[in-house]
Amino acid sequence: MVEWTATERTHIEAIWSKIDIDVCGPLALQRCLIVYPWTQRYFGSFGDLSTDAAIVGNPKVANHGVVALTGLRTALDHMDDIKATYATLSVLHSEKLHVDPDNFRLLCDCLTIVVAGKFGPTLRPEMQAAWQKYLSAVVSALGRQYH
């Protein structure tokens, strides 16, 4: 179980309060698929992902970005039991979808870049530290089934 300070919780809540899931979710997944093109293999049913423009304009990518970020947001309400919160998703991604667990980290790295771009200098280092800890806890929980 991850231990959270009151300050960390406040920072994470502050970041989530300013994230527009409908904007940041698609941007993070688009960035992930473009920067790490090997991640595209999990999205064969999404249609054309052959160019950056095709990825950015793909409504299935945008929709899944919203789904992924909505799922990531779930941890905010369950910070004291993140592993249990993601147990079912961990099984799904490992046993049915066979997703490389490192891809969770790649998506979260892309999300951090999107968030930093939106926040600019208001995303102070101590806020980013709390955010990274939060994302690491979620990535660990999602990859738990693989261990």
Swiss-Prot record:
Gene Ontology biological process terms from the UniProt entry: hydrogen peroxide catabolic process
Keyword check for Transport: yes
Gene3D superfamilies linked to this entry: Globins (1.10.490.10)
Residues in Globin domain copies: 3-147
Keyword set, alphabetical order: Heme, Iron, Metal-binding, Oxygen transport, Transport
PROSITE patterns linked: GLOBIN
Subunit and interaction comment: Hb 1 is a heterotetramer of two alpha-1 and two beta-1 chains. Hb 2 is a heterotetramer of two alpha-2 and two beta-1 chains.
PANTHER family linked: HEMOGLOBIN FAMILY MEMBER, HEMOGLOBIN SUBUNIT EPSILON
Protein name, per record: Hemoglobin subunit beta-1
Biological source species: Boreogadus saida
Chain's gene name: hbb1
